[in-house]
Amino acid sequence: GIMDSVKGLAKNLAGKLLDSLKCKITGC
């Protein structure tokens, strides 16, 4: 349903944000 796709999008965004934070902190 719509909520499932919203949750999926949120997970993708959170993952990208976490990855970029890790890159800034520890280097990629």
Swiss-Prot record:
Q: Where in the cell is it found?
A: Secreted
Coiled-coil spans are: none
One GO cellular component this record assigns the protein to is: extracellular region
Q: Which keywords has UniProt assigned to this entry?
A: Amphibian defense peptide, Antibiotic, Antimicrobial, Cytolysis, Disulfide bond, Hemolysis, Secreted
- State one Pfam family annotation: Antimicrobial_2
- Family assignment? Belongs to the frog skin active peptide (FSAP) family. Ranatuerin subfamily.
Asked if the record carries the keyword Disulfide bond, the reply is yes
What are the disulfide bonds? C23-C28
Q: Which GO terms describe its biological process?
A: defense response to bacterium; killing of cells of another organism
Which tissues is this chain's protein expressed in? Expressed by the skin glands.
The main location is: secreted
What role is this protein assigned?
Antibacterial activity against Gram-negative bacterium E.coli. Very weak hemolysis activity.
Q: Which InterPro entries match?
A: Antimicrobial_frog_2
The molecule here is called Ranatuerin-2BYb
